Amino acid sequence: MSIASVWNIILIILGFGMLIGLHELGHFIAAKWAGIRTNAFAVGMGPVFLAWRGGIGLTFGASKTKVIEKFGKDASDMSDAELKEHGLSETEYSLRYLPIGGFVSMLGQEDGKPDSVSNDLRSYNMCPIGKRMVVVSAGVFMNLLLAAVLFIGCFQVGVRFEAPVIGQIIPNSPASETITTDGTHLQTGD
């Protein structure tokens, strides 16, 4: 495999990670706007590579073990008052090893248990349906916004394409009557 191929694969992975990160950021911003408690914001899947939580700081791996060591239970099990008392933020921001996805973990939205319900007023399921619709569609909105920004950027800067060049002229063809040498650049489509 050539270096160019490896570089292209790296660019694809970074681009995919950016797309997912912005998509999840849309859900995250909308959840915060709706007043929904967000326990985690992650880019990537699998084990945690780096994590940051207010009150704990940057950690290699999840901050959960440090929170439990320091306060006796996980931050996701603490009330808002307990988080404030301990100086912890409600959200753990993490970068994970596999750049194939991402997620926002909201209180009352358990993907593994779709029938789970939380009675907390800041949970996803207690949020009015209109706000939940905004939260669900915010990821798609961010993807559309990114597409618009990229298109505008491409049209402003421009994209260079190689000029069409005649490679070979077949003798006694209509082209041979008008074009005399190989390598001629086409100027118009006529």
PLM regions: where:
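Alpha-helical transmembrane spans of integral membrane proteins, capturing the lipid-embedded, hydrophobic core
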Residues: I13-G17, V136, V140, L144, ...
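Acidic active-site catalytic centers that drive phospho-/nucleotidyl reactions
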Residues: E24-H27, R132, N143
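Small-residue-rich helix-interface/hinge motifs
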Residues: A4-V117
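Short gly/ser-rich anion-binding loops that grip negatively charged ligand groups
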Residues: Y93, S123, K131, V135, ...
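PDZ peptide-recognition modules
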Residues: S2-I3, G61-L88, E110-G130, M142-D190
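Hydrophobic (often cysteine-bearing) scaffold residues that line and stabilize catalytic clefts
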Residues: M18, L22, G130, A138
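Hydrophobic, aromatic-rich alpha-helical transmembrane segments
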Residues: M1-I9, I13, I129-M133, S137
